[in-house]
Swiss-Prot record:
Its EC number is 2.6.1.11. Pathway: Amino-acid biosynthesis; L-arginine biosynthesis; N(2)-acetyl-L-ornithine from L-glutamate: step 4/4. This is Acetylornithine aminotransferase. The lineage of its organism: Bacteria, Bacillati, Bacillota, Bacilli, Bacillales. It comes from Bacillus subtilis (strain 168). It comes from the Bacteria. InterPro entries: AcOrn/SuccOrn_fam, Aminotrans_3, Aminotrans_3_PPA_site, Class-III_PLP-dep_AT, PyrdxlP-dep_Trfase, PyrdxlP-dep_Trfase_major, PyrdxlP-dep_Trfase_small. NCBIfam families: argD, PRK01278.1, PRK02936.1. The gene is argD. It is found in: Cytoplasm. It catalyses: N(2)-acetyl-L-ornithine + 2-oxoglutarate = N-acetyl-L-glutamate 5-semialdehyde + L-glutamate. Belongs to the class-III pyridoxal-phosphate-dependent aminotransferase family. ArgD subfamily. SUPFAM superfamilies: PLP-dependent transferases.
Length: 385
């Protein structure tokens, strides 16, 4: 009997080794990993530069608290500020914690309380994260929710009309590609309406880049595809290539809202995490690296569209190396079949197969994955005729 709370529906796979795009389980079986910790190991498992940076830091100092100066934090913050729309950075431990910090910052900086988010969004499982999330299923049994959140339809430029002259809006918070909501990209028209609404209401724009950031979509941050100017950006997942870390990035005019004692964390920004972040960002923010990731994403999408001609496949969508295959029915059996074939993927809702390979994936590995997907979908279609 397990001593763990049963909060996860775990597969019967125990990963013992991982390198690059491949993992090996307890039985010695090798899998092509197109999950990568759910968009975490963007440089692939156990990337040499990140591994060496963390090993080196292990022999120096791990943690001393944020009462002390931290040059590694400063270096990482400067990298994030140089490659984003923000100027100031707060380091934490996870995406949920980053989104909590963003919500606190927005309310404190504006003196207003209402936060606009969107249906099918996902912003975490803490109380502010749940309240911001536009999916009732994750809130069941945990009420009452934190107040002040209003939900609008995603990808509907006219949705803001429903708010009328409503004021006291601190921020609009959204993902430019909804991950847990089905790998659902926003349209340029919708995002333009979001930016205009924020300007009209003098509300802050918070972009949740937890899953889309750090090169995942072929840009440093997904909002760059649309010319947006966010006031606050949240990142985590790929930020440390597997080391737990998150960050809130904000414009300099928000600095007065976060002063000593207003917000904090014990472990956030510890030296081990910062070693991983600095090594990761040093690679990801190279222009050639991002262009290669974008090219690989385009190649993967082209291969999927060329090979997955089954009537069961309704749409292939996403950006960069964050793609979803929407199917005409549940995909759980296909995902299980793919595990048998040696390919790890995950769902994004009941009918969507989500693909999150590392940004270092090769074209041969992409071809291997597409071949397995084609085989599994064909088998599913034959069995369910």
């Amino acid at each position: 009997m397990s001593s763990l709370f049963q909060t996860y529906g775990r597969w019967d796979i125990d990963i013992k080794k991982a390198k690059g795009t491949y993992v090996e389980d307890q039985n010695g079986k090798t899998y092509l990993d197109f999950i990568q910790g759910i968009a975490v190991s963007n440089l692939g498992h156990c990337h040499e530069a990140v591994t060496e940076a963390v090993k080196k830091q292990l022999d120096s100092v791990w943690h001393v608290s944020n009462l002390f100066q931290n040059s590694l934090q400063e270096q990482a913050a400067q990298k994030l500020a140089a490659h984003s729309a923000g100027d100031l950075v707060f380091f934490c431990n996870s995406g949920a914690e980053a989104n909590e910090g963003a919500i606190k910052l927005a309310r404190k900086a504006t003196g207003k309380t209402k936060i606009i988010t969107f249906l099918q969004s996902f912003h975490g499982r803490t109380y502010a994260g749940m309240a911001a999330t536009g999916q009732d299923k994750i809130k069941t049994g945990f009420g009452p929710m934190l107040g002040g959140f209003h939900y609008l339809p995603y990808n509907d430029p006219s949705a803001f009309k429903a708010l009328g002259e409503e004021g006291d809006i601190a921020a609009v918070m959204l993902e430019t590609v909804q991950g847990e909501g089905g790998v659902n990209p926003a349209s340029a028209e919708f995002l333009s309406a979001v930016q205009s609404f924020c300007k009209e209401k003098q509300a802050l724009l918070i972009i949740d880049e937890i899953q889309t950031g750090i090169g995942r979509t072929g840009k440093g941050f997904a909002y760059e595809h649309f010319g947006l100017s966010p006031d606050i950006i949240t990142v985590a997942k790929g930020l440390g290539n597997g080391f737990p870390v998150g960050a809130v990035i904000g414009k300099k005019q928000l600095g007065e809202a976060f002063t000593p004692g207003s917000h904090g964390t014990t472990f956030g920004g510890n030296m081990l995490a910062m070693a991983a972040v600095n090594a990761t960002l040093q690679i990801v923010f190279q222009p050639d690296f991002l262009q290669e990731a974008a090219d690989k994403g385009a190649f993967l999408k082209e291969q999927l569209e060329a090979e997955l001609k089954s009537p069961f496949v309704k749409q292939i969508r996403g950006k960069g190396l964050m793609l979803g295959i929407e199917c005409d029915g549940p995909v759980a059996d296909i995902i299980a079949e793919l595990q048998t074939l040696g390919l790890l993927v995950l769902p994004a809702g009941p009918n969507v197969i989500r693909l999150l390979p590392p940004l270092t994936v090769t074209k041969d590995e992409i071809a291997e994955a597409v071949s397995k997907l084609k085989q599994a979908i064909a088998h599913h279609s034959a069995v369910n005729q």
